[in-house]
Regions:
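Solvent-exposed alpha-helical segments within well-ordered globular domains of core cellular machineries
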Residues: 26, 30, 34, 71, ...
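Active-site-flanking beta-strand signature of metal-NTP-handling nucleotidyl enzymes
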Residues: 4-10, 55-56
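A generic structural motif
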Residues: 12-17, 60-64
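Amphipathic alpha-helical assembly/interaction segments
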Residues: 11, 27, 31-44, 66
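C-terminal binding/interaction regions
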Residues: 21
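Absolute protein N-terminus
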Residues: 1-2, 96
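C-terminal structural segments of small proteins and small subunits
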Residues: 59-96
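Short, charge-patterned binding micro-sites
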Residues: 41-62, 94-96
Length: 96
């Protein structure tokens, strides 16, 4: 069994408060969950209102499937962030 994990660092230039940050992060998490069968969580519940880190995890018997899934998640995250006025500044994928 394989585990695929993706960490996304997001810059939120349009966010002027923690409320704005939570709104963007929640929307991004919900859309990724709805589009892919993955677990999504905010990894740094800090009070920095213009930056967030989101973790995405999936489990499968096929590493090739997870590789494709994580690539699709990264592409979707870039698109979703762009639509929300945010920017993915870094992404890291790891397989365990």
């Amino acid at each position: 069994m394989f585990v695929g994990a993706c960490m996304l660092t997001i810059h939120l230039p349009v966010s002027a408060s923690l409320k704005d940050k939570r709104q963007v992060v929640r929307s991004m998490k919900d859309r990724l969950r709805a589009s892919f069968n993955v677990s999504v969580a905010e990894l740094d519940p800090s009070n920095i209102w213009n930056q967030a880190t989101i973790g995405v995890v999936a489990i499968s018997h096929s590493r090739d499937y997870l590789d494709g899934l994580m690539k699709n998640v990264e592409r979707a995250a870039l698109r979703i962030a762009n639509n929300l006025g945010a920017e993915v500044t870094d992404s890291f994928v790891e397989f365990l």
